């Protein structure tokens, strides 16, 4: 007989552009088949899931189920830590995908449909995965740090997420692809110094710097198709500067992962990545798990087996 785990469910009703709120009765019914007793809290503001998760774990919770997209899961994962220490190293994260972006679940083989996700919650064990920690400069210019689960990237990706957020505030169409296209049309590659472990990359202009723990980002783009959540290494994918016409010709490769063979793309594996703008360069935006939070300079550190998650590798 399986042990009954003290369970907390954290729901972001605004995820999936509000569809989670509409689907909640269906999701709740599915959860009842998985577990009879659990506490539930709905988030009402950004970063609230961090506080809920942290408080719940301090109260002895053993399983936190996140209902939302990658941003919601990122917040919950940050709540598993108090500074640099896990609050309860034996507690696990369960996932019910319900967001505009559910890229992490692809690396964990969690179906996006409700029945499949519930089956994983019921049948999958709690597996240890690596996580990332990034120290960066906040939008207010202060030193900050945050954990991430899937992918953190700087350059074009940070600009795209800012455009997505801007359009949402203006209640305009904010699909990732539309925002990517509009951003590429005006984006200029940046001069960045990059160091991976003990190796300094040649100084160059970079369009994308993706520090990948998982395989997929940007609503399904296979940025690091060979990445693994438990190999103890980041897959750092560095895309050098391209003219607009060149990117339009080659950018489709990101969808199926074939970009790694292109001459302006480098893949380097390592446990620590440091990225610093060249002097005089304009601010370079950083995003992690689909949330734009600050700028370079930044240091990305891999935390081996930093979190237990219900899923399959």
Kindly label every feature range from the protein language model.
Residues 153, 157, 210-224, 292:
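Glycine-rich phosphate/pyrophosphate-binding beta-alpha loops
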Residues 196-203, 223, 228-229, 238-313:
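ATP/nucleoside-binding phosphotransfer catalytic cores, i.e., glycine-rich phosphate-binding loops
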Residues 21-23, 76-80, 106-108, 222-223:
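Short amphipathic alpha-helical segments
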């Amino acid at each position: 007989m399986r042990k009954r785990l003290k369970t907390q469910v954290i729901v972001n009703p605004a995820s999936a552009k509000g569809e989670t709120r509409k689907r909640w009765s269906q999701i709740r019914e599915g959860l009842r088949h998985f577990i009879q007793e659990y506490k539930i809290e709905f988030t009402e503001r950004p970063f609230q899931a961090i506080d809920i998760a942290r408080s719940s774990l301090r109260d002895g919770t053993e399983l936190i189920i996140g209902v939302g997209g990658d941003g919601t899961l990122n917040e919950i994962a940050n709540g598993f830590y108090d500074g640099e220490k896990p609050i309860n190293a034996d507690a696990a994260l369960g996932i019910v995908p319900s967001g505009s972006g559910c890229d992490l679940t692809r690396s964990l083989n969690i179906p996006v449909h409700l029945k499949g996700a519930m089956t994983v919650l019921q049948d999958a064990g709690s597996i240890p995965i690596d996580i990332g920690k990034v120290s960066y400069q906040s939008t207010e210019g202060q030193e900050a740090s945050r954990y991430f689960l899937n992918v953190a990237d700087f350059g074009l990706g940070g600009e795209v997420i800012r455009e997505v957020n801007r359009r949402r505030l203006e209640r305009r169409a904010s699909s990732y692809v539309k925002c990517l296209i509009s951003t590429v049309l005006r984006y200029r590659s940046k001069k960045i110094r990059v160091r991976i472990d003990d190796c300094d990359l040649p100084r160059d202009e970079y369009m994308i710097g993706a520090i990948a723990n998982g395989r997929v980002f940007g609503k399904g783009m296979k940025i690091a198709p060979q990445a693994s959540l438990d190999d103890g290494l980041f897959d750092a994918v560095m895309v050098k500067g391209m003219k607009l016409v060149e990117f339009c010709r080659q950018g489709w490769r990101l969808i199926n992962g074939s970009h790694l063979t292109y001459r302006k793309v480098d893949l380097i594996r390592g446990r620590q990545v440091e990225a610093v703008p060249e002097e005089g360069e304009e601010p370079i935006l950083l995003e992690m798990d689909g949330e734009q939070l600050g700028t370079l300079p930044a240091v990305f550190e891999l935390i081996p087996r930093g979190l237990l998650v219900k899923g399959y590798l």
